[in-house]
Amino acid sequence: MNKEYTLLDLYEIYCEAMPRYPLAYERFRDILHKDNSQIFTAESSETIIGFVVVNGNSVVILCVKKEYRHSSYGKHLLIMAEGFISASYDEVVLGGGGLFQGVPCDEGEESSVPFFEKRGYNADFTSVNMGLTLNEKSVQKLKEIPRPDGVTYRFADDNDREKLLAAVKDAQADWLPIFEENKDAPVLLAVCGDEIAGFEMVEEYGGMFFSDNEKHGMIGCVGVTHKYRRRGIGLAMTAEGSLSLYERNCKDIQLLYVERVAWYNKLGYEVTSRQWMGRKKIQDIMF
């Protein structure tokens, strides 16, 4: 990055380009300072026009000022990112979860998806984010969700570690690394007798997109073991987790990478954004 420009300059470009995805400056700064992140910029003789952030094989953010769009600046930034990634990886991923899962493609806004499709990117699916504003109405709805008999809900402690990992392996083995690496993350359990029937991560400071000083919670990795499925345990557990965030004075709750949209609708959650999960093999890149 040209030393003439500051992170605040980049932040201002981001805020203009991504109004639907607000970030506090400190959060933006931390993303750009993440280990091994690389920043490339597009500049005119007078000002910075856009930038792209790369981490690993992911294009984390690509932003161009509105008045300079459709003028090849985005294309050249992407070429720089792809060239850097190609030195170490065989695939380029758009988003990658450092900030965005993929490419924002929300209704009512100009989509960047055609820009990436034109350059050989493909996506198998579109990821959905959801949210719930915590107020009297939404809390009442959560309280009305039926609670199955014989199930209690509590947060996990160190004594639950072995059983928790076994439950995760049974319900969704792909999540094991997440729970192993984040052993201090708060996890709400649904317990039947001496068995863990369900689990979910509940974080009062886990929200991603906000620019105020309020608390924004997040719920993730919601799972129920095979033995206890189809009893309403997952829905009740998520209602309990949501209420626990309300009790900790969270303003809202954010969900990322949602697949079961209709299921979360039952709890009052609504779709807030959609992201196109684009990627491209290095051999498809032309320099």
PLM features: what roles do these ranges have?
Residues I79-P148, G278-K280:
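Acyl-donor-binding surface of acyltransferase catalytic domains
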Residues S37, A87-D90, C250:
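Short, high-confidence coil segments that cap the C-terminus of an alpha-helix
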Residues Y21-S44, I48-I61, K169-V224:
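A conserved beta-strand-loop-helix scaffold within acyl/acetyltransferase catalytic domains
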Residues H70-S86, C221-V224, R230-L243, E247, ...:
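Conserved acetyl-CoA-binding loop-helix of GNAT-fold acetyltransferases
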Residues G50, F125-V128, A197-G198, S273:
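A structural microfeature
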Residues V59, V92-G96, V103, I219, ...:
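Conserved hydrophobic beta-strand within the GNAT/NAT acetyltransferase core sheet
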Residues S58-S71, G98, I219-R229, E259:
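A short, internal acetyl-CoA/4′-phosphopantetheine-binding micro-motif in the GNAT/acyltransferase core
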Residues M1-R27, S127, Q140-D174:
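Short amphipathic alpha-helix that is part of the acyltransferase structural core
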